[in-house]
């Protein structure tokens, strides 16, 4: 899997909602909920629609074909 963008975190984990805000795909948690229902989002190859999903280092996220890695 080729990763196009790396997202660095300071804490042990971030939520999927926080991730979407960091990469400027949404502005708020409510917007994240709607976004996840209408955009194909994968975490480590599995479909995900929970905005509270914890993302840790080395997780791979794909949003509408754009790939990211948490580091």
Residue ranges and their predicted role:
Residues 1-2, 43:
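A short, structure-level motif marking secondary-structure boundaries and short turns
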Residues 2-14:
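A detector for short, charged/polar N-terminal pre-domain segments
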Residues 5-6, 60-71:
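A positively charged, amphipathic N-terminal helix/segment that binds anionic biomolecules
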Residues 15-57:
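A basic, amphipathic helix-loop patch mediating RNA/tRNA/ribosome contacts
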